Amino acid sequence: IMICSRLDHSAKGCILFFVQLLRSMYHLATSNICIIDSYWPAVSMLKHKKSLKVIQIWHSIGKMKKSGYQSLGKKSGRKPEFAGYLKMHKNYDYFIGGAPVWNKYYAEAFNIDESRILNYGLPRIDYLIKTQDSNRAKFFEEFPGLIGKKIVLYAPTFRKKMKSHWHDILRASKYDDIIIIVKNHP
């Protein structure tokens, strides 16, 4: 079962989100394993049966920004009271991480003991490596004028209440042989 839902703050969006929460509560009650890649209220806020194992695989590649408990009370983070009310990132039995060098930062961000972090690598990286050549070929087929140019991808992470600085980066690029591609966070 896969449940994907974002909170749309309209009345209809709130109702649909609530329906997804109820649906996920049913599946949490009837499953033995839950794999999650973000925060989900039904996982963190509810008490679950002992046989349920919750595995957090997170959705980023590595730990390059402060998030979760590391950013509480900061401009880009949640208010501590809000995080406490939502029991932010609670009930994870295991966390799948990349290299052990990131463990300290994952433990801080998710408020978990490092012994719960399993360094199995990140599935997303395997996919990107396996498809690298075909993705490159497709890209240059679509944009043949970029062959031979240096290409820089700027893909800023999402931060609420903070503006992206990609305009400044574009202005700083003074070289004709450098192409900057901006891909904003969804």
Question: Predicted segments — roles?
Answer:
Residues 1-130:
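Active-site and donor-binding regions of nucleotide-sugar-utilizing enzymes
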Residues 1, 109, 119-186:
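Conserved catalytic-core segment of nucleotide-activated headgroup transferases in glycan assembly
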